[in-house]
Regions:
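Alpha-helical transmembrane segments and their helix-start/interface "positive-inside/aromatic belt" motifs
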Residues: 36-52, 162-169
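Transmembrane alpha-helical segments and their short flanking loops
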Residues: 175, 180-257
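Hydrophobic core segments of alpha-helical transmembrane domains in multi-pass membrane transport
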Residues: 13-23, 48-61, 108-116, 132-136, ...
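C-terminal structural cap/anchor segments
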Residues: 118, 124-194, 202-204, 229
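Transmembrane helical segments that form the transport core of multi-pass membrane transport proteins
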Residues: 69, 73-114, 122-127
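Outer-pore turret/helix-boundary of cation channels
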Residues: 47-82, 87, 171-197, 214-215
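Juxtamembrane interface elements at the cytosolic ends of transmembrane helices
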Residues: 14-40, 53-66, 90-93, 133-150, ...
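Single conserved hydrophobic/aromatic residue that forms the stacking wall/gate
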Residues: 1-7, 11
Length: 257
């Protein structure tokens, strides 16, 4: 039992540190207190903690009477916490992912889609992108013009980039899923989508579909992993040539939404 516990603790520690990124780790080492951390580090640490907590609670509630039915309470909580942490980074699993409920699969996909911090070992859209977009959405609903957090205002440029990243990521995942459902018509949509999101987040979790893949599926999954790791926005910027700056601006128009 002890080697298993030690191994699990090491996996959790390495997964969390790997998902934070070296900028946050170095900042933590130098700052020594939360108040002295940079805005980036505060965002990453706060969002990471909330995602781990939310993932743990919902995974426990959803799988308590399913994949973790025959476990004790402490073991259930430990497994829920482990899956919540590793789903966003390392991709290790202590339960059979192929037997989880559909709502649980959707939960894990959401965590994998968000991923870890920028400049970390994780893929996905990144936690900073997620939290900036979330803040902008809530402030828009509240009719608040200024987007700020931790007494710092968020630049409109970052908000724009966050929404662009999320939209092109959703479009990319949707396109790849559409292609794979054509190639692998015998596999349920939810399982194909899970594989694509897992690859995009460079997580590696699978619902035991490797043996059922057809033709070019493995190659497509590899491409998705590379895109998730490098970042679709970075790839798009590298492929699309920059536009020459204009020395003039048009009069603003009004559009009804």
């Amino acid at each position: 039992i002890m080697p298993s516990l030690v191994g699990s603790e090491m996996c959790i520690r390495d997964s969390i540190l790997g998902g934070l990124g070296h900028l946050v780790v170095v900042d933590l080492w130098n700052a020594k207190s939360f108040r002295k951390l940079s805005l980036h580090s505060k965002l990453v640490l706060t969002t990471t903690g909330l995602l781990i907590l939310i993932g743990t609670v919902f995974f426990f509630l959803l799988e308590n009477q399913n994949s973790m039915l025959h476990m004790g309470l402490i073991e259930k909580i430990g497994n829920a916490f482990f899956q919540s942490v590793t789903t966003r980074t390392a991709g290790f699993n202590t339960i059979d992912v192929g037997n989880i409920k559909t709502p649980t699969a959707l939960l894990l996909m959401a965590l994998m889609f968000i991923g870890g911090a920028p400049l970390s070992a994780a893929g996905g859209i990144k936690v900073t992108t997620f939290v900036i977009a979330t803040i902008a959405i809530f402030n828009t609903i509240r009719k608040e013009k200024n987007n700020s957090i931790f007494n710092r205002e968020i630049s409109e440029r970052y908000i724009q980039l966050s929404f662009v990243t999320i939209l092109i990521s959703i479009a990319f995942i949707g396109m790849v899923t559409f292609i794979l459902t054509i190639i692998n018509s015998n596999i349920p949509l939810i399982k194909v989508l899970f594989e694509v999101v897992s690859a995009f987040g460079t997580v590696g979790l699978t619902m035991d579909l490797t043996s059922e893949y057809y033709n070019w599926t493995e190659f497509i999954i590899i491409i998705v992993m590379l895109c998730g790791k490098i970042g679709l926005l970075n790839i798009s910027r590298a492929l699309v040539p920059p536009k020459d700056p204009k020395n003039y601006r048009y009069t603003k128009g009004h559009i009804h939404l």
